[in-house]
């Protein structure tokens, strides 16, 4: 018994000594060895994550804009039903919890290591995110955001955030040319061609001045003229795109529109209005139509179980305005009208699908077979056309016409049209659909169709009676070139009120058009300083145009 007590006592004493000696190390033991901190973080990996998160963020913003501007179908009968407080939760969290937080973490690491190119890319993306957030919501948290000591940041004025983004763009240009610079970032966009990054920055400045032209025409005019004089914006081959792959396994590297539609059919409905503009409006097919859309059927259905609207009269506002309804023509271009709330009939392998551009689906060579096979077409190796060289010409055309900046608006417009028509084909030929495209449309035939199209558009511009009519021609052609980029389409519509004659909603009174979105639910329930907007009709600071229904 005495021996047992001795052993027990010795064990307790030893344990106490051990515990005492470890007490000083307790804080160290509580640290997670797998947690990323400033000492262990890789600036390269951080920048990788920032770039990947940005493409996802941009896609969410772009997709909503495309639906609102009739580039693809917008479901729901009313705008307020289509876009509730929770509709943009992902955009908000991706911006703040991912991209902006990671950039804030990256910046001091990059400064300490003199990673100038990392800083240039990060600040360019930061500026784009800030501008996109203002374009989406107007006032958002900025100066008090991403602060571990402040869980309830207040919003900043949208105009002030825009100005801060312009400062970031100027700083980014300096980082792209600074010497010396260490490090070789993994650049998903330009493969470390920093001359192109500088041209992108200048192009983003052009967009900044164009968006703010209604706030300060003189500042915008001077800013754009300076950029024209410098002559260093995006040119052919400088297109700022995110390139997808063909891997279906997790993580799926394919274009999201392809993955959604070509796996088992179904997916988005195309916009009846947009397809009509590309296939019927001019009396001949837009050369891009077969690249944008793939018809799973070459004829319209006669079965109302597949397409209910074929047995129904158009709404009164369609009849009075002479708008396309239900189907754009008779050749199997099968989509839906704006704000169509109907359910989903068995038409997944009949409705018009996404084509080869930009989501790397199939080129429409009249084969008219279902798209329920992920090995079809370009297999999803598509792109996000975030900022193309052709867009520069359209923006300069608008600026020349509305601000009187240097240059001829018609020449800019026709240059943009030709540049985009050629880009759509040249890019599509790089996909696995290249041989199909060349066999169906030889290069000489496509060139002839491009020439004819440009001639027609130029004549339409010349025939436009007023400046606003001429602006409508420019904007319509820009809008048609923006397939895959609803962000710029949404801004164009709010900024100019054009294209005119957008297809109306099926409901006669769908509510006010979305000028900015409601603040998301995940912000409203976590920030005590958050104040929700009264409705979707609140306008971004640079949109000083009349209230809706100026646009609808």
What are these model-predicted stretches?
Residues 1-20:
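Sec-dependent bacterial lipoprotein signal peptides
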Residues 12, 22-24, 50, 127, ...:
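Terminal processing/anchoring signals of secreted or surface-associated proteins
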Residues 420-552:
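C-terminal functional modules
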């Amino acid at each position: 018994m005495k021996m047992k007590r001795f052993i027990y006592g010795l064990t307790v004493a030893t344990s106490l000594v051990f515990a005492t000696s470890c007490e000083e190390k307790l804080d160290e033991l509580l640290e997670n060895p797998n947690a990323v901190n400033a000492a262990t973080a890789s600036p390269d990996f951080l920048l990788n994550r920032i770039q990947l998160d940005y493409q996802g963020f941009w896609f969410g913003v772009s997709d909503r804009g495309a639906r609102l501007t009739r580039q693809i179908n917008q479901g729901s009968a009313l705008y307020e039903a289509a876009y509730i407080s929770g509709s943009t939760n992902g955009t908000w969290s991706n911006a703040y919890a991912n991209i902006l937080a990671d950039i804030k973490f990256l910046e001091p690491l990059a400064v300490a290591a003199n990673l100038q190119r990392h800083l240039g890319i990060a600040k360019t993306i930061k500026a784009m995110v800030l501008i996109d957030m203002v374009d989406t919501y107007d006032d958002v948290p900025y100066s008090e955001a991403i602060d571990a000591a402040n869980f309830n940041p207040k919003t900043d004025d949208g105009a002030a955030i825009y100005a801060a983004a312009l400062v970031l763009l100027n700083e980014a240009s300096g980082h792209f040319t600074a010497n010396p610079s260490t490090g070789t970032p993994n650049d998903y966009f330009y493969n470390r061609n920093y001359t192109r990054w500088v041209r992108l920055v200048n192009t983003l400045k052009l967009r900044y001045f164009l968006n703010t032209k209604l706030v300060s025409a003189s500042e915008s005019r001077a800013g754009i003229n300076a950029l024209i004089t410098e002559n260093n914006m995006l040119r052919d081959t400088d297109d700022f795109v995110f390139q997808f792959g063909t891997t279906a396994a997790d993580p799926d590297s394919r274009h999201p529109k392809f993955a959604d539609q070509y796996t088992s059919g179904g997916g988005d409905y195309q916009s009846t209005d947009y397809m009509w503009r590309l296939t019927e409006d001019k009396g001949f097919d837009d050369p891009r139509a077969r690249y944008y859309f793939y018809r799973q059927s070459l004829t319209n259905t006669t079965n109302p179980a597949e397409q209910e609207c074929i047995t129904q009269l158009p709404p009164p506002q369609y009849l009075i305005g002479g708008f396309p309804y239900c189907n754009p023509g008779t050749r199997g271009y099968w989509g839906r009208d704006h704000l169509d709330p109907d359910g989903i009939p068995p038409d997944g392998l009949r409705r018009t699908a996404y084509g080869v551009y930009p989501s790397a689906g199939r080129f429409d060579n009249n084969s008219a077979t279902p798209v329920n096979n992920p090995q079809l077409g370009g297999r999803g190796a598509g792109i996000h056309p975030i900022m193309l060289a052709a867009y520069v010409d359209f923006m300069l055309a608008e600026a020349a016409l509305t601000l009187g900046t240097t240059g001829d608006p018609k020449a800019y417009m026709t240059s943009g049209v030709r540049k985009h028509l050629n880009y759509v084909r040249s890019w599509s030929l790089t996909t696995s659909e290249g041989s199909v495209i060349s066999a169906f449309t030889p290069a000489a035939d496509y060139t002839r169709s491009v020439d004819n199209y440009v001639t027609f558009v130029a004549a339409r511009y010349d025939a436009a009676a007023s400046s606003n009519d001429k602006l409508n021609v420019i904007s319509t052609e820009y809008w048609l070139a923006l397939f895959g980029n609803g962000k710029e389409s949404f801004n164009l519509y709010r900024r100019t009120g054009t294209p005119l004659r957008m297809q109306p909603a099926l409901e006669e009174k769908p509510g006010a058009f979305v000028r900015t979105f409601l603040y998301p639910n995940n912000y409203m329930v976590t920030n005590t300083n958050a104040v929700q907007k009264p409705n979707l009709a609140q306008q971004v600071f640079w949109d000083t145009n009349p209230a809706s229904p100026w646009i609808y």
